[in-house]
From Swiss-Prot:
Reactions catalysed according to its record: coproporphyrinogen III + O2 + 2 H(+) = protoporphyrinogen IX + 2 CO2 + 2 H2O
Positions contributing to a divalent metal cation binding: H96, H106, H145, H175
Positions of the record's site feature: Important for dimerization: H175
Listed name of the protein: Oxygen-dependent coproporphyrinogen-III oxidase
SS bond list: none
């Protein structure tokens, strides 16, 4: 089947609705929607839940942008895209909970297609989800990765290990020499064997996010925390900001190509702190995190 951008867009709009409904049901608060238009073509729906019962901030963004020509920053690496019109669409989300025992989560699914008359379209899917705990619980990481493995299984035995490794490699802070969290799945440039297969996989990843995350939220939401745990959470959130502003390709691409800044930076935690050369107390739960987030086979 030839690529069907309209079909993908309809799925993404439904996915945004579904994820927002499930997060809202878990939290008790509602999302506020901000619809926006892009002057050069397209637009989106940014939805944010703030200061809820569980989530300090949850942002779920849908965007669909199109144009007559790709920006130079994109065609420099992919000369075959020069002279083509393009469409890019996706759903991306980040959830920052109040409770430091609940991890931060991130998910993204996206589709890109570039066309010109008389030539085959160039298209691909990308996406994934990853988990960033502040306090490590083995059963949470195992559940997260088991959900990822199970949704990959129908697409081949090698899919989960390949995209898990890609996720571990991608969400790595080179300047800190540490992982951002316990990973999950990451894939990009997916266009084989055919459109239907790739679209089905992207849908499985998008639909799998709440199955992976919400049971962890339920398990941790009643745990009691205080100033010590909150301070550590805010300190570790600094790593999240560092990764997004220094290393994340999507953030950099969006900012460099005149994307909508408010939507791009919706992933940022609302509060964060840095402290010069801070070291956790030896033997403490905070000190245990650095070992917990080391790359390993969780399932």
């Amino acid at each position: 089947m030839k690529p069907d951008a309209h079909h993908v867009k309809q799925f993404l709009l439904r996915l945004q609705d579904d994820i927002c409904q499930k997060l809202s049901a878990a939290d008790g608060a509602n999302f506020v929607e901000d619809s926006w238009r892009r002057e050069a073509g397209g637009g989106g729906r940014s939805r944010v839940l703030r200061n809820g019962g569980i989530f300090e901030q949850a942002g779920v963004n849908f965007s669909h942008v199109h144009g007559d020509a790709m920006p130079a920053s994109a065609t420099a690496h992919r000369p075959e895209l020069a002279g083509r019109s393009f469409e890019a669409m996706g759903v991306s989300l980040v959830v920052h909970p109040h409770n430091p025992y609940i991890p931060t989560s991130h998910a993204n699914v996206r589709f890109f297609i570039a066309e010109k008359p008389g030539a085959d379209p160039v298209w691909w899917f990308g996406g994934g989800f990853d988990l960033t705990p502040y306090y490590g619980f083995e059963e949470d990481a195992v559940h997260w990765h088991r959900t990822a493995r199970d949704l990959c299984q129908p697409f081949g035995d090698d899919v989960y290990p390949r995209y898990k490794k890609w996720c571990d490699d991608y969400f790595f802070l080179k300047h800190r020499n540490e992982q951002r969290g316990v990973g999950g799945l990451f894939f990009d440039d997916l266009n084989t064997p055919d459109f239907d297969h790739c679209f089905a996989f992207m849908q499985a990843v998008g639909n799998g996010y709440t199955q992976a995350y919400l049971p962890i939220v339920e398990r941790r939401k009643a745990m009691v925390w205080g100033e010590r745990e909150r301070n550590f959470q805010l300190y570790r959130r600094g790593r999240y900001v560092e990764f997004n502003l220094v290393w994340d390709r999507g953030t950099l691409f969006g900012l460099q190509t005149g994307g909508r800044t408010e939507s791009i930076l919706m992933s940022m935690p609302p509060l964060v702190r840095w402290e010069y050369d801070w070291q956790p107390e030896a033997g403490s739960p905070e000190a245990a995190l650095s070992e917990f987030i080391q790359v390993r086979d969780w399932v």
